[in-house]
A protein has these predicted regions:
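A short interface-forming secondary-structure element
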Residues: 48-60
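N-terminal intrinsically disordered, cationic/polar leader segments
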Residues: 25-49
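Short, small/polar residue-rich loop motifs at catalytic or cofactor-binding pockets
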Residues: 21, 31-33, 57
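Long amphipathic alpha-helical segments used for membrane anchoring, targeting, substrate engagement
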Residues: 1-29, 77-99
Length: 99
């Protein structure tokens, strides 16, 4: 196989993968669903939903912990999804500069 053709195919695959990752919408929750977040493939927080039951002066610290946990879980899920997509594309190989 022509090395130049292979490089072009890899570049096209990389571009497709980056487009797929950009459209990811990952949801995660904490506190039994009391706090839910949606994060995109670049780990930007897109939405945050908080059950009104956890919003009170006495529960602020718990709410902060739940939000932190939900955001961290969403980031972990984004990483996991990206690794699955890359693994399928590259057959498990680590390709420098793919993301």
């Amino acid at each position: 196989m022509n090395p130049q053709k292979l490089m072009n195919q890899l570049k096209q695959a990389q571009e497709r993968m980056q487009q797929e990752i950009a459209t990811l919408q990952i949801e995660a929750a904490s506190g039994g669903g009391m706090v839910k977040v949606v994060m995109d493939g670049q780990k930007n927080l897109k939405s945050l939903r908080i059950d009104p039951e956890v919003v009170s002066k006495e529960e602020v610290e718990m709410l902060q912990d739940l939000v932190t946990a939900a955001v961290n879980e969403a980031a972990r899920k984004v990483d996991e999804e990206i690794q699955e997509k890359i693994g399928g594309l590259a057959g498990g190989m680590k390709i420098p500069g793919l993301l």
